[in-house]
Swiss-Prot record:
It is found in: Cytoplasm; Nucleus. GO terms for biological process: potassium ion transmembrane transport. Forms heteromultimeric complexes with potassium channel alpha subunits. Its EC number is 1.1.1.-. The active site is at residue 67. It comes from the Eukaryota. The keyword Nucleus applies. Belongs to the shaker potassium channel beta subunit family. This is Putative voltage-gated potassium channel subunit beta. NADP(+) binds at residues 33, 62, 67, 167, 193, 222-225, 233, 243, 301, 303, 307, 310-311. It is an enzyme of class 1 (oxidoreductase). Its main location: cytoplasm. PANTHER family: HYPERKINETIC, ISOFORM M (PTHR43150:SF2). It comes from Schizosaccharomyces pombe (strain 972 / ATCC 24843) (Fission yeast).
């Protein structure tokens, strides 16, 4: 049974501001998608994973109302309570949009009703009086943007969240939200949660770049290993029992297309670069995301504590990704970055 670690002690994981806000988040965070709350991932299992992350210097945790139909929030909330952490020492982000089970007319989307009732339900499942960041899990074109921004502003003013953000929103939608916030003296979002990895780059590096530069828009990026593809485990086929053979079967099919085969070849080549610097393919891919200073935190997914230990070692390779190595990776990917000084 995992023992309680009451006080947070930062280790080697660096901290970054969430965009231009004053909130500091660990460069790696731990997410509950596909794991905690699902079958086989009960409170005890979740607690062991959260404690391992905490002991390594991670204090930021991500979930959503839709994850395991709300059970992810329930299990993670119970695990945190049993670990006895001081509320001021960790950061929780959750998301509303998809609902947490039954899809009734007002239990999904971004109406003011669902945004407020959805977070209230999330807080009840988490067993917390507030979250640090509440995010709109997807845009909702059926709801006026003013209603959306006013609802999130109300949650913050009511003390149920400190900040709000977006997830997989377009640059135009984020800009629209900022415009509404400025026009009506409301609270603007501070960060987006986009998919970002070395095979999925255009939206984050090009579409969102102006928002990062103008507003200092932050990012809590997900799928840094692209559902495991960047780990190298699929370089020689799809192992039986792996997520691509069970959960992401459509993605497995995509790997059989000419484009998919090209991507696997690119992963093989980049895996050789990882070997040259002493990293695993996963560690290189994770370190690569953190070379981008516009990334506030990279969300890790882990089904067991040992995976967290190995993935967090990626911080040791951030500085080893020199401009020459980054250029070589871009050449392998046949990707031309914008001419900006965004890497450090």
């Amino acid at each position: 049974m995992a023992s309680a670690t009451t006080h947070f002690q930062p280790k080697n994981v660096p901290f970054r501001f969430l965009g231009r806000s004053g909130l500091k988040v660990s460069a790696f965070s731990l997410g509950g998608w596909l794991t905690y709350g699902n079958e086989g991932y009960d409170v005890e299992h979740t607690k062991n994973c959260l404690k391992q992350a905490w002991d390594l210097g991670i204090n930021t945790f991500d979930t959503a109302e839709i994850y395991s139909n709300g059970n992810s929030e329930t299990v993670m909330g119970k695990a945190i309570k049993e670990l006895g952490w001081d509320r001021s020492e960790y950061v929780i982000t959750t998301k509303v949009f998809f609902g947490a089970g039954t899809k009734l007319p007002n239990t999904t989307g971004l109406s003011r009703k669902h945004i407020i009732e959805g977070l209230n339900a999330s807080l009840k499942r988490l067993g917390l009086p507030y979250v640090d960041v509440i995010m709109a899990h997807r845009p909702d074109p059926s709801v006026p943007m003013e209603e959306v921004v006013r609802a999130f502003t109300q949650l913050i003013q009511d003390g149920k969240a400190f900040y709000w953000g977006t997830s997989e929103w377009s640059a135009f939608e984020i800009e629209h939200a900022h415009h509404i916030a400025t026009k009506y003296n409301l609270i603007a979002p501070v960060a987006d949660q986009p998919q970002y990895n070395y095979l999925t780059r255009d939206h984050f590096e090009k579409d969102l770049l102006p928002l990062q530069q103008i507003y200092g828009y932050g990012a809590t990026v997900w799928s840094p290993l692209k559902s495991g593809i960047l780990t190298g485990k699929y370089n020689d086929g799809i192992p039986e029992g792996s997520r691509l053979s069970t959960t992401f079967t459509s993605l497995a099919g995509q790997l059989q297309t000419p484009e998919g085969k090209t991507q696997l070849d690119q992963v093989r080549q980049i895996s050789k670069i990882a070997e040259q610097i002493g990293a695993t393919p996963s560690q290189l891919a994770l370190a690569w995301t953190l070379k981008n200073p516009y990334v506030s935190t990279t969300i890790l997914g882990a089904s067991k504590p040992e995976q967290i230990v190995e993935n967090v070692k990626a911080v040791e390779f951030i500085d080893k990704l020199t401009p020459e190595i980054l250029k070589k990776i871009d050449e392998i990917l046949n990707f031309t970055p914008l001419e900006i000084q965004y890497r450090r």
